[in-house]
């Protein structure tokens, strides 16, 4: 049985300026509020400078400055963003240990992407000692918040018995959740499990259904499996 590997990717920096306090913030308003010490504004200003949103000229040094200020004032989003800067080496020297530290701070505050990223670093042993039990812990927290990549990696840990007792039933459960959230690798793995009767009785109809969904998403392995099942 061919099972696709864990999703060892960390998402590129995708930031949003939407919040209840600043539905459509002007640059001048954000700058003023940031200078007054408001952490939401400091975070937003940092993101503007980091991404060039709203016509702001990118300035990584200033982005780092304002995100650091927001972090010191308790902004969870700033902690995550600083982690991403260190992880990608954007505006700072790439430093996996620092990335780990910032992801850990944001993860402790319930930030789902940070929890997933922390799980990945534990899983890979980057920025910290490899620890499957900790990877399981943080994937679980992010998965419970409905974060699809975490659902997928959690299923993979159950399937392989890494950091947790091996359980095809639990692997099937979490692959299903990820598959329903359009994770094509999860759709493929779920189809394989139904095809082979792992975690559930064999079910060719469901196997074909999930192979088809993965194939529709562009998975070449799923396309080959569908041909072999015709």
Task: Give the label of every model feature segment.
Residues 9-18:
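Bacterial N-terminal signal peptides
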């Amino acid at each position: 049985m061919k099972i696709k590997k864990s999703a060892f990717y960390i998402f590129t920096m995708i930031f949003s300026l939407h919040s209840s306090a600043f539905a459509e913030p002007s640059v001048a308003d954000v700058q003023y509020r940031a200078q007054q010490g408001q952490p939401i504004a400091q975070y937003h200003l940092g993101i503007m400078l980091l991404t060039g949103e709203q016509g702001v000229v990118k300035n990584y040094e200033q982005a780092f400055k304002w995100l650091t200020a927001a972090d010191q004032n308790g902004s969870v989003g700033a902690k995550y963003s600083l982690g991403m800067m260190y992880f990608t080496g954007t505006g700072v020297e790439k430093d996996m240990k620092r990335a780990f530290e910032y992801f850990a701070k944001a993860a402790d505050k319930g930030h789902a992407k940070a929890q997933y990223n922390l799980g990945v670093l534990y899983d890979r042993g980057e920025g910290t000692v490899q620890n499957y039990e900790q990877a399981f812990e943080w994937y679980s927290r992010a998965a419970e918040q409905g974060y699809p990549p975490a659902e997928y990696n959690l299923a993979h840990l159950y399937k392989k018995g890494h950091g947790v007792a091996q359980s095809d039933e639990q692997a099937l459960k979490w692959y299903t959740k990820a598959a329903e959230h359009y994770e094509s690798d999860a759709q493929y793995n779920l189809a394989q499990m139904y095809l082979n009767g792992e975690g559930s009785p064999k079910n060719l109809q469901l196997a074909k259904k999930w192979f088809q969904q993965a194939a529709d998403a562009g998975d070449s392995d799923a396309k080959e499996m569908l041909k072999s099942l015709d």
